[in-house]
A protein has these predicted regions:
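Sec-dependent N-terminal signal peptides
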Residues: 4-13
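Outer-membrane beta-barrel proteins and related beta-barrel translocases across Gram-negative bacteria
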Residues: 43-44, 83, 123
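Sec/Tat signal peptide C-region and signal peptidase I cleavage site
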Residues: 14-19
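Short, low-complexity, Pro/Ser/Thr/Gly-rich segments in the mature regions of secreted, periplasmic
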Residues: 137-149
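A mature extracytoplasmic/lumenal domain signature
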Residues: 80-84, 126-130, 140-142
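N-proximal, solvent-exposed amphipathic alpha-helical segments enriched in charged/polar residues
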Residues: 21-73
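Mature extracytoplasmic domains of secretory-pathway proteins
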Residues: 58-114
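A short amphipathic beta-strand at an alpha->beta junction
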Residues: 105-136
C-alpha cells in the first residue's frame, strides 16, 4: 500500500497547523521546541485532530481511506478502511500484518519524530471496508521507533 503519501499528508498538516497557531511560539525553519511540545501535548493532539478531521474521509490510495481521527489524551488515533477486493479478512491479517506494521512504524517515526519525542504518540487502526472487522492496530511510540534501528 502507498503509506508514504499518507505520511506526507500528516507532515503537511502538522506544519500548517503549527505555523498558524498563536498559542505556540513562532518557530524558525519549521523546528518545534521539544519542551513546548511536551508541556502542551494534549492540546496539540486535540488541535491536530480537529484540523485533520475537517478533511475526512480522505482516500489515501486505491485500497485505503482515512475515515476518522480522534485523540486519546496525547495519542492521535487514526482509523482507516481497507478495501481488499476479493481477499478475505483472515488472509489480510495473516499475510500483511508484519509488512504493514513495519512500513507504518518506519514512516511515522521518520515524519513525526519531534512529536514522538514530546510524548505525542500515534495509533493506526485498520478495518475492513466490507465487514468493518478490525484488521490491525499499530501503536507508534518513541520506544517503537528506537527498536527499528
Amino acid at each position: 500500500m502507498k503509506l508514504f503519501s499518507l505520511l506526507i499528508i500528516f507532515g503537511i498538516f502538522y506544519q500548517s497547523l503549527f505555523a498558524d497557531t498563536a498559542t505556540l511560539p513562532k518557530i524558525q525553519n519549521q523546528e518545534f521546541p521539544k519542551e513546548e511540545l511536551k508541556k502542551q501535548k494534549i492540546q496539540i493532539a486535540s488541535m491536530v485532530t480537529k484540523e485533520i478531521a475537517k478533511t475526512l474521509p480522505q482516500k489515501i490510495d486505491q485500497y485505503t481511506t482515512l475515515i476518522s481521527i480522534k485523540n486519546d489524551d496525547a495519542t492521535l488515533v487514526y482509523t482507516f478502511d481497507i478495501n481488499s477486493g476479493a481477499k478475505s479478512d483472515e488472509a489480510i491479517i495473516k499475510e500483511d500484518h508484519s509488512r504493514m506494521q513495519r512500513a507504518v512504524t518506519q514512516g511515522v517515526c521518520q515524519s513525526s519524530s519531534k512529536f514522538l519525542e514530546a510524548g505525542i504518540n500515534t495509533r493506526y487502526i485498520y478495518k475492513s471496508a466490507k465487514s468493518k472487522k478490525r484488521l490491525f492496530v499499530f501503536d507508534i511510540t518513541q520506544e517503537a521507533c528506537s527498536k527499528l534501528k
